[in-house]
Amino acid sequence: MPRILVIDDEQLLRSTVVTILTRAEFSVEEASDGRAGIAMFHKNPPDIVLTDIFMPNRDGIEIIKELKHSSPRTKIIAMTGGGHLRMMEIAAAAQVLGADHVLDKPFDSESLLAAINAVLGSLPPPKNQVGA
């Protein structure tokens, strides 16, 4: 089962995303800011990181830079709100840095799950374990 780390400082949005992903039978962990999210990532790297862009204690752009530098194969979905033009600028910056997908807030559960499934389709197959 793919593991997802959700990093967002907005508690209500984070809880909603965690609920949607848990109901879809994903294993989910959550962090309330960038610093906590990076620490959780390094402790137990997930398959996918779903991160807000605008947060205290390390924003999403910093998270994308660090995680792609330390773990280039990590799949990252960036979430952001804002005006349309601003969203396009942020999406372009996030993708240049290595985000695999960008979700514009607010989004519905179908859009969230479609983004997760699109990113899952690009995950490498699991390594075969000898003797398993």
Locate each region found by the language model.
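Acidic catalytic/metal-coordinating carboxylates
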Residues: S32-A36, D59-E62
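Short amphipathic alpha-helix used as the core "switch/output" element in two-component signaling
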Residues: A39, I61-R73
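Active-site residues of response regulator receiver
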Residues: D8, D52
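Receiver (REC) domain active-site loop signature in two-component systems and cognate sites
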Residues: M55
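Alpha4 helix (beta4-alpha4-beta5 surface) of REC/receiver domains from two-component response regulators
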Residues: E62, G83-L103, E110, A114
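Two-component/phosphorelay signaling modules centered on CheY-like receiver
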Residues: Q11-E29
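Active-site beta3 strand of CheY-like receiver
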Residues: N44-L50
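Hydrophobic/aromatic residues positioned on beta-strands within the core alpha/beta folds
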Residues: M79-G81
